[in-house]
């Protein structure tokens, strides 16, 4: 907070505020202590104005003690509350509006009046202070704004009228204290000062990724000039931020743009104390260069080379390479200064420097833990943006969310509002119908409700005023989860139970295959508990086994349990990648080829949904070289697409399915997967499968996979369970047509028997159900049998399937197939 611009009396007010907080044993300095501090300076304008409204020091003390009372014995350093910080900020804003160089007691009072929340605002309300009249009285007591300040400002601006209309003076903004503090960029600011102090080509250009703080360095220079922390050569300089869009805007005719830019350059040359800051420096190239006219960069080149124009540029690495480097004459006139992304530790320090501003704006307390969480979580989970920008945005949005949540109107107030509206409408209807007695009763009822509403509203506001809303680590995690879809909040009891019982959830859809289900469940639990390797995917698995045993179904079931729907799974059918060059479809077509701008089928989906299940189905069908691209995904959790963007796979579950080796195992007596689920038989099966797998895939690929799981052949009992699941799905579909079906155990056993084929797994069951159930039901529906609203029982008598149709309460009719 900038206390250097406070008058001596205003500084004493802050000292009195601290003394009052200590006297009342309060742990923070709030708006009420600032008000008490103002009353302790009776000669100040603020105290005189308040006394003129019959508000005395004793009355204020009485109200404050009544509202918040004395605290426990306070310990440690006193800090300003977010609302008190906001009041100081508002007082500086008031001083600037009135063209005053210093902040006095009167400006602090104006700040308290503008801050309509907090204890001070409640004191004013309780003492019946007319806010509008009080403000007018303060302005009247001050007299007219100081003309000397206005004239000084006018004289300063008269030298550069065109420039003032097109640019923002960062030094003036820094003097007003409205620029955010710049933390941890001393090295870069010093380097900028060194380049600016050169005799010729004294033009630094700040190059760095978006969001690393390039513009902040120019603002830091302006603040250093205001504080006199620069060499003699830069003292009293003005840093003017020029927007090329504003310069070009409105130049309808040829030569108008060039004339405007020349005038700006002449004013800068004559003034001799202007440093031009051009954000997005690459916009110089081509600006105003339509119809053969020369562009802005060519107009500026001579002045930049001779040192007549001091210019700081800022641009990204990509734009510098595309626009500045290709023009060698322009490039040599600028001295590049690399601005690197700060570390997580540096980002935490930057956030601590900005904390006061965000606390004042959102009127909440921001803890150190929240700042650390913002820096660490944004660094880990938001991979396509840069620190400190993404961490600052995270703090800003989380603070906004907490603030809005704490100020949502309670339901009882909304109910009273609705009741008032209802009574108003009834009263208007009664007046219209000339039922005046009824209208009078309704008017009285409305008055009572309005009073009740005001009382409830004041009670809620008073309760809110006494609360110190704080931003916690959990709030930061909630916002990150909203941005990325990755669950980071603390695990609640419901989710904990769901994760612990994940095997049961998966078994509702996948019958048998305990090894696969257990392995997948453990990987998900490790990730959610925060124990997984942060540089690798949540888990990577190869599912081996014959067709139709549930490999793909398990991936679908996992996607449904994690995201609520099977469609959340990213499915890549490897049969589409039988040719070597097809790998480009995963990461995007190379430059110059059709589809380069569309991105890769895999990388784009993962960029949009970083928390997902990825299924590579039937991997043995793809060309072996396709899997080379997955090596760094399995090991380091990232993949670079054809546009050079790094895609983060660290929050994905990667599942690959294959039935490689299934034929060889089928030829062996024990290796039909049946009865080989445990003991040495299962190990033999596994070794056989691994041998076939090694013949098909390279060792460096297999070595990176977390687990290779062999699926077992489905037994008859398991097939019967699958029949029950399939019948339940059919029952659900028919219930939408108001048809109820019941399939007996005998019928299910017969369907399982007809659909049993150890070579093809569960898929023949689909055909068996179609043949025995669906075909006959469709004929019954189309044959004129009105079975809507009736129940159909499907049974097997040892020879054939029987279909009994009957009303829910009536006797059965019997038809046979």
From Swiss-Prot:
Region described as I: 163-410
Region Repeat 1: start-end pairs: 6-71
GO biological process terms on file: cellular response to heat
InterPro entries in alphabetical order: AAA+_ATPase, ATPase_AAA_core, Clp_ATPase_C, Clp_N_dom_sf, Clp_R_dom, ClpA/B, ClpA/B_CS1, ClpA/B_CS2
Residues that bind ATP: 208-215, 545-552
CDD domains tied to this protein: AAA, RecA-like_ClpB_Hsp104-like
Pfam entry (one): Clp_N
Keyword terms, alphabetized: ATP-binding, Chaperone, Nucleotide-binding, Repeat, Stress response
A cellular-component GO term for this protein: cytoplasm
Keyword Chaperone set for record: yes
Sequence segments annotated as region (II): 471-662
Coiled coil start-end: none
Function field: Required for growth at high temperatures, probably by acting as a chaperone during heat shock and targeting heat-denatured proteins for degradation by ClpP.
Protein name as it appears in the record: ATP-dependent Clp protease ATP-binding subunit ClpC
Source species: Staphylococcus epidermidis (strain ATCC 35984 / DSM 28319 / BCRC 17069 / CCUG 31568 / BM 3577 / RP62A)
